[in-house]
Amino acid sequence: DMEWAIDRSGRVRWLQARPITQLPGDLNELDTSPDPSHVYTWCNIGEMMPGAVTPLTFSITGRGIDIGMQQSYRRAGVPVPQTEGLRYVGMYFGHLFLNLSTLSEISAHVAGSSKQQMCVAICGRDIEEIPEPARTSRLRRALSGSRYFYQLVSAARHRRDLDALVADLRVPSTGAPEAIYQAIDQNLHQVWKAYELHLLSSSSSGALSPILLGILAKGEDPSQEHHAEVAQMLAGAEGVESADIAEGAERIIDRLVEHPDASVRFSAADPTEAFEWLCSAESGPAGEELARYLERHGHRAVRELELRQQGWADDPSPLIVSLQSGLRARIRHGARPKPADRATDASEHPILRRLLPIAHAAIRCREHTKSGLVRVTTEFKRAYRGLGKAMADGGLLPDEDAVFFLTHEELGQRIGGRLELEEIAESRRRALDFQMPLHFPQLFRDRPEPLRLEAVEGEDGALLGKPVSRGTVTGRARVVETLEQAAALEAGEILIAPITDVGWTPYFNLIAGLATDVGSAVSHGAVVAREYGLPAVVNLRVATTRFQTGDLVTLDGNRGTLKLA
């Protein structure tokens, strides 16, 4: 590491030099081997798992997604070969990507499916770089099409099967490292099954969105207005599991407002002390409401399929901070008006009138099974954390957090005596900080290169994104890069964030609108924004760098734009 300066004459002067001791590990150490002819994307998977993942998460979540997709394709009649490798998921620089080329093979074997529908479901548009696969015989496609249709209408059964799996799953988290690892290993098939059932129950939701767009666009490329109209149609879904995360937080705040000591004992307290008070008998109905909330939603969190990330039941501090912000806003500004029913009248579209109830049911099913999948993941999070503690206590790892920086297979090898893995885990932990903020092209072949995102602008200089919840609002911007920064949100501000997953939901009762760099019509933020009647635009790419907190901005959820007011 050499430090230098240039003097007035232009001569270079060396100031000091020292050995570099904290270089990260290889950022591409665990990269998968790409097929140079295949097209990859971060769409969909980058919304579900934004940023880089730990090696353990790659070996469980990444593989779980891939196995779930393989099984759902086989059920639909696609002849997917048995393989130990990944077919539909890739990882580069620690980030997960989907292989659109292999995913498009469903259109070759299943009647009623097409490459275009698959691309619209994942990326919101057709991808011309992917050729339409050569199709098999009509008879074979018809038979597979009937199997695929049966799969779409069997979502309720898949939901029940996942509920039963969740109810029966128990993975030990204490004992000797060998015993914990063996218990985890013997139960991994439950993770693969959970992903399969979630993807099967979600398939109808993914299939219906491009169908609705196609009907509105009458076979042409869908416009911003078509995307906005579909978003308004989807807003009619009721009883969505993830929407209750925000509504449940509101119920806790309702009880806190009624408590005479809440402003001192909760709102102004340290988050740890506030949680302890809320769990005590002194908090009364507010504490009872929190207990019910954690029973239903305690497994949820930001980046909740990352095994290193604890749920709210195990680390309640992010939830408590959001409740404190909500209580302070309620005291200053009063309760937020309930959103009006914004569901569209589809009576002019006979086909849409029949499809909308099915689409709403599909959204409810997808969000319910996503919650079940996270419950399964949480059981393994706790087991792996227990394994990390046992390995650290036994001198096999430097600390329990290091467990997340070895793959599942490598953990077994470390228990078996492979010494160098301890140092490898430390190196990967340093690499994660370098991998996390990287951005990549939406589409690429071969290996991607990190890039600086470029804006897409409309005629008036406004940032152009995808409208996912209708309405227009003007207000002060709150630019938030991390969930921790969201604690500064004030009532009525427009939240501008890289992406919002379930961990951000408790703040939705504060904001007046939502703008994100990344997202789609079925991403979590879009679903909850529609339920709350919030204007929302996603896929703005550079909103978090273009705007600053305090800017007066106009968010147009009809046109899909964000600009200075």
Indicate where each model-derived feature is located:
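Extended active-site and interfacial segments that coordinate phosphate-rich ligands
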Residues: 15-68, 72, 81-85, 513-515, ...
